[in-house]
Amino acid sequence: MSKEDEVSRIEANVEVIQGYLLSQFKGFELIDREDPPISYTFTVSKSPDERYLLKVSWTQLSDRTNTPEKTKQCLITDDVAGRMKGRSQGEYFWWKKNL
């Protein structure tokens, strides 16, 4: 596995997650931040009082068996947006899925 392949896979999976979050949190601003090799964080916010946070492990994003299609399906199946909304404001939802 080349470094370029890993970077491309991570970017593709991040784009899928961004699209999912923007579709589930209409009217919200999305900010994401990478923290390699640990995690990638996503913050969707409408105001300081309405903010939802998501963390995804770096290994989950880079795993070669984790295609963008699989990521999209798992986001829906795992109801990631609903679970993010179920957290207290300012508390991250750490999304881990079985690959």
Residue positions per predicted region:
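Intrinsically disordered, low-complexity regulatory segments enriched in Ser/Thr/Pro
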Residues: 48-89
